C-alpha cells in the first residue's frame, strides 16, 4: 500500500464528448469471437476503442516531434516515475496568440535551485478550468529562451502543465516541443487538480500504455504527497 496522500491529476475521459476523438463500440464477446460461448442472459462484452493519442490528459513522447525519438513503447519506465516540483504561474494571463502572457527566463531562474537534472516540472497555469470549453486552448506561455534553458542547461526530465500547451501560439512547427524532444524530454498536457496539491514537491506517476510506434498517450497522472 502506498503511503502518502494521492491526488489524481488526470481528467476523466468522456466518449463522444472530447475535443480529440474518443469513441467506444460495444459488442457481446461471442459476436467477435464465436469460441467465447455466452448465454443470452449473460453480460459478457468486448469493446473497440477509437481514440486520439492526444485525448485528455496525455503525455507526448519524443517521437511526437523527432522521427528518431523514443516512443510510448521504448520510453524508459523509470523516467515516468519520479520527483516533481510544482511551479505556480496562476498569476499569468491565459489568452490567445495576441493576449497570452509570457513566462520569461528570469522568472524561471527564481526556482533555479529546485530545478535539478532529471526533475519533473509541472506548471500550474490555472487552465484546467477551460478544459472542454471554447477557451480550451487559452494559456500563458513559456518563451523559447526559457524552454531552451530547461532543456539544455537544466536538463529536466519532463515538462507538464494544466493547459493544452506551454509555448507561444501561432509560431510554426512548435520549436519548444522540438528542442525538448530532440533531447528526449517528454511533455504532459491538460493535467488537472493541481490546485488540490498541498505541497510543491511530490512523487509523480505517469501511467501510459507501452505501445510501439505511439507518439503520445492518454495517461492516469497520479501525485503522491508525503504525509
For the regions a language model picked out, list residue spans one by one:
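Active-/binding-site microenvironments in catalytic and ligand-binding cores
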Residues: 1-227
Amino acid at each position: 500500500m502506498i503511503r502518502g496522500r494521492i491526488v489524481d491529476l488526470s481528467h476523466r475521459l468522456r466518449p463522444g464528448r472530447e475535443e480529440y476523438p474518443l469513441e467506444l463500440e460495444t459488442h457481446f464477446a461471442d459476436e467477435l469471437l464465436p469460441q467465447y460461448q455466452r448465454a443470452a442472459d449473460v453480460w459478457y462484452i468486448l469493446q473497440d476503442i477509437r481514440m486520439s493519442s492526444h485525448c485528455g490528459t496525455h503525455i507526448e513522447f519524443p517521437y511526437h516531434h523527432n522521427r528518431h525519438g523514443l516512443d510510448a513503447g521504448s520510453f524508459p519506465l523509470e523516467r515516468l516515475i519520479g520527483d516533481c516540483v510544482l511551479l505556480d504561474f496562476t498569476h499569468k494571463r491565459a489568452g490567445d496568440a495576441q493576449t497570452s502572457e509570457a513566462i520569461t527566463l528570469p522568472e524561471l531562474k527564481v526556482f533555479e535551485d529546485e530545478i535539478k537534472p532529471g526533475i519533473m516540472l509541472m506548471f500550474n497555469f490555472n487552465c484546467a478550468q477551460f478544459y472542454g470549453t471554447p477557451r480550451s486552448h487559452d494559456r500563458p506561455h513559456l518563451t523559447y529562451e526559457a524552454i531552451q534553458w530547461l532543456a539544455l542547461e537544466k536538463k529536466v526530465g519532463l515538462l507538464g502543465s494544466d493547459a493544452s500547451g506551454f509555448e507561444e501560439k501561432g509560431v510554426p512547427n512548435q520549436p519548444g516541443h522540438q528542442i525538448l524532444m530532440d533531447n528526449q524530454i517528454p511533455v504532459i498536457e491538460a493535467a488537472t487538480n493541481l490546485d488540490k496539491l498541498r505541497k510543491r514537491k511530490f512523487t509523480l506517476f505517469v501511467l501510459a500504455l507501452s505501445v510501439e510506434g505511439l507518439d503520445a498517450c492518454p495517461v492516469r497522472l497520479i501525485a503522491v504527497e508525503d504525509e
